[in-house]
Amino acid sequence: MTLARFVLALVLGALPEVVSFDSVLNDSLHHRHRHRHSPPPGLQYPYYLPTQQRPPRTRPPPPLPRFPRPPRALPAQRPHALQAGHTPRPHPWGCPAGEPWVSVTDFGAPCLQWAEVPPFLERSPPASWAQLRGQRHNFCRSPDGAGRPWCFYGDARGKVDWGYCDCRHGSVRLRGGKNEFEGTVEVYASGVWGTVCSSHWDDSDASVICHQLQLGGKGIAKQTPFSGLGLIPIYWSNVRCQGDEENILLCEKDIWQGGVCPQKMAAAVTCSFSHGPTFPIIRLVGGSSVHEGRVELYHAGQWGTVCDDQWDDADAEVICRQLSLSGIAKAWHQAYFGEGSGPVMLDEVRCTGNELSIEQCPKSSWGEHNCGHKEDAGVSCTPLTDGVIRLAGGKGSHEGRLEVYYRGQWGTVCDDGWTELNTYVVCRQLGFKFGKQASANHFEESTGPIWLDDVSCSGKETRFLQCSRRQWGRHDCSHREDVSIACYPGGEGHRLSLGFPVRLMDGENKKEGRVEVFINGQWGTICDDGWTDKDAAVICRQLGYKGPARARTMAYFGEGKGPIHVDNVRCTGNERSLADCIKQDIGRHNCRHSEDAGVICDYFGKKASGNSNKESLSSVCGLRLLHRRQKRIIGGKNSLRGGWPWQVSLRLKSSHGDGRLLCGATLLSSCWVLTAAHCFKRYGNSTRNYAVRVGDYHTLVPEEFEEEVGVQQIVIHREYRPDSSDYDIALVRLQGPEEQCARFSSHVLPACLPLWRERPQKTASNCYITGWGDTGRAYSRTLQQAAIPLLPKRFCEERYKGXFTGRMLCAGNLHEHKRVDSCQGDSGGPLMCERPGESWVVYGVTSWGYGCGVKDSPGVYTKVSAFVPWIKSVTKL
């Protein structure tokens, strides 16, 4: 046993359920013997004219592949190799160039992807195929660069085996012609060259053969009598190519089943080009497909290259046209597809893009140049498939309106949320290093569809369509918002001034939130010292938003985590990115996360006018115009801004005008507010001591819908006693003319009253408490909400004995791990429940309880339905 087989036995023999040394050796020999007499998958055993048994192959089976040395490092790739959609060059130790994508063994078994090989490969020593392990392809390879290419495959018993590959499988050649551009088509399969019956053979089939052989852009179908071919198998008949396939194997066809080929003719071709024999023969060499490669011309009996001096996309357009390759034409420079050999045929090619052949373009004389093969020109003719991108309407393919191909039509991309990271991904896919977004309407508007909107790239994507985006065709844009881009090949003057990546967190939508920046590998926040709308405008501009921007301070969108990266930002409002505004050292600050800065982009806040009659007021009660999610009283969550439009706060006036929160309350109409009587126990019922704030969300940040209204009258229920919790209800009349005290808007609306003696446990569902009360750590700056269940009164009667009366509601969670309750700051605030029909009713006023969120101590709420006649008599509602 050779050393290589011994090593293979050690590695594989330990896993008998997967594969063993004996199975590899014996099964391999068995399969090779068996497949010489049975058809490989997908290809029937060929018949002959005249019919005759195929002679067996007599060469001995090859030895097992030795465990090769670790592969040498691949050559460094130029930055262009990052271009998405551009397949990497074939592994240098696979099948030779020209047939680099063979993925079938020499007896016809399809190869497994290298990523699909069983787990024992992961445990092997620094195995020779370390660079192949996990690769998402199944191309035959020879990792040590010395032996024949091979691959793993699944045998008939479901086990993994390996086999050598025949790199010529699927190859074609032309035989018997007057030159290399014509002849009978022969196909190589299962170790034997065979031919194709000429039935239904046409120019589309012939063109695929010419493409595969890189012998010009057009094939002309011919026929050859079988009588002159001798003994040769027939593989296929009725070949049905579309004409743009890369390989004849990709065309539809019928497996030859014997019988008589019509007219006894074999398929043949003459490779030419679309526009007459005066044009030179062109081929593309060294690419990953027939659609790209180094440009080579056939002139004076030999192949040669083209120098890339003045080589551009217009030249590439002509090459692709001459080769009958549709799609997007792009020029490549500096021997991108490898250096050629032989003479440099042409230099200084200057096509306009409209020529039919490179021969018609201005250029140097044949053979005149000052170039070496390091300057060999190349082209790619990218087929038009869904997701292909281009820049249109500019002076060249490096600039213009960004367009995406989808369902046979080019369309544009809306600039909503467009960032420089998006630009970077687009330019990189197009083969450029840098780029920038062009100004709006810089290029002519498109008249086609708008395919994409709200695109967001991280900058790591290799293809534009890997970025997050809306569904195809979903947008809210016009062509005035089409993205336009200018890309550049390099140079410091064109670098993207990306600054730090920026994101918005914990907002109600993607256009608002706490500002976080990515610095030194970690996301962190910005302190709000000096934070203004000008700073917000720069953040929004960097994120691609063009509308008005508003700054938010005091952790308006909640406190962040991690470091505070930046403080004392000083933007003028004209900068392109946040990085241009930072003057202080990163990480230097004197802040806490309670001062985290935020922004609202595309802000169009506008107050609604006040309502003036009772009928309109009653018609809008209990409506939540803004509610989509649910955060924290104790166990609660931040509410949505405007989500509880009847929530108001009773505030204690001060000489400094910054009255502190005293109690919560509920807006019943433009001029009347419902709260708890005990809120006035300490400071009395003098109206001069109080003010009511409506439309509030963050207690320390003034907002557009927020309004503070004076108090005209305080009405405490006549049965309330300060030493008792019964009859704990009060009404507050706001200052202002009749029903024009607080101005209604989407953020300021009244709640509905319940029916008299209505029992909410039977008629209501989906109950919430709201307020700015104790959150378990401190009083909240933002309005909180918490879902809460209504409980049978016996739970409170058992817990509070005679202190609980029939004019009270019992609500809350009894379990310690579900700590939801109202606390001191929420006194007087509403307990709201939803009636069928989506109207919200104030069933309770937060009154009292034992502690906050204490186990087995539910909250007690004044039952509003018991006081409806009193409320209506006072308010005249």
Swiss-Prot record:
Glycans are attached at N26, N685. This is Neurotrypsin. PANTHER family: EGG PEPTIDE SPERACT RECEPTOR (PTHR19331:SF465), SCAVENGER RECEPTOR DOMAIN-CONTAINING (PTHR19331). It comes from Pongo pygmaeus (Bornean orangutan). Disulfide bonds join C95-C167, C111-C151, C140-C165, C197-C261, C210-C271, C241-C251, C307-C371, C320-C381, C351-C361, C414-C477, C427-C487, C457-C467, C527-C591, C540-C601, C571-C581, C621-C752, C663-C679, C767-C833, C796-C810, C823-C852. Residues 633-876 form the Peptidase S1 domain. Its EC number is 3.4.21.-. Its main location: secreted. InterPro entries: Kringle, Kringle-like, Kringle_CS, Kringle_sf, Peptidase_S1_PA, Peptidase_S1_PA_chymotrypsin, Peptidase_S1A, SRCR.
